[in-house]
Structures are given as structure tokens and as C-alpha cells.
Amino acid sequence: SSDLPNAFADYKFDIQQFKNIFNNYKFFNGRPLTKSMITWWAYNSDDQELMSLETVIEIEHIYARNRFEKEHSLTSKEIVESLGNKAILEKRINIRASDYRFEDKKKYYNGYETPRGPKAGTKIRELTNLAASNTDFKESDIEARYNSILNSFVDYLKSNELIK
């Protein structure tokens, strides 16, 4: 163990400043931080198993963008792009589940039978839990999930002594 002082002490986050930056950040799919945050969120759960490194992962909009275009049932288009509406999902499933209503996506998250055999569901535990416990995924769910992600990340920063 080193007796040197922690040089990182000068770079710790001010909690309010961090929350302001986080709340103003646009988590668009093309920004690397978006996929990093939702991957952190998925693996922050103790019951999330590791997936094969060969697994191709994409960003899933739990509340489909296409659904917003058709129904206009959210107060703004920005909510579709909220971090609270995004999850990582295997590409093989995202292709099938992309434009459906939540009640239809549940089948793809859970897996289903076809005449040619079973189609495996996602290994993302949060999505299978959502499918088991929710009949829909609405604006209030997006907001609650966003707040859970933010608060959990702040707790993570605190537990690693990264907050001033």
C-alpha cells in the first residue's frame, strides 16, 4: 500500500453539479455514454448474468419510437430518447421487437414457441422482470426508471468515494 495522498481527491464530483449535468445531457443512441450507462445499469443488478462477449448488443427503446409516432401518447418526443426508456438488448431480439407496443414486446423479451422451435428470450434480467410485472410501459414508468438510474449511479459514486 502506498503512503501517497489520493491525487484524485481534487477531481471528485459535486453532487448537485453532477445531477444538473446528468439531467441536461442528451442520451442519444449515437453517443457512447448512452450505451455505457444502460450497460452499467443492467449489470448493476446482482441477478444479471454475464453474456458472451460475442453477443451483439443494441439499444432498445422500451417504449418504441414508432409507437410514439403513431399514438402521440407521450408529452414530448424527448421522453422517447430518455435514458429511462433505453435498455441494452441482444440484436437478434431487438430486430424482432423494435416497433411493437410493450404488450407485444413482452413475447420477445420472454421468448416464445414457433412451428420451427423455441425462440430464446433476452438475457437482460430487467427486461424479463418488466415483462413479468407490467402490462404497459408508459411515461410515468420512463420517468421512474430514469430517476432510479440516476439515483443508483449517484449512490455508486458515493460508495466509491467519488462525491465531494
Q: PLM features: residue spans?
A:
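Intrinsically disordered, low-complexity N-proximal targeting/linker segments that flank membranes
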Residues: 2-79, 83, 88-89, 95
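Long, cytosolic, alpha-helical-rich C-terminal regions that act as interaction/scaffolding modules
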Residues: 79-82, 86-164
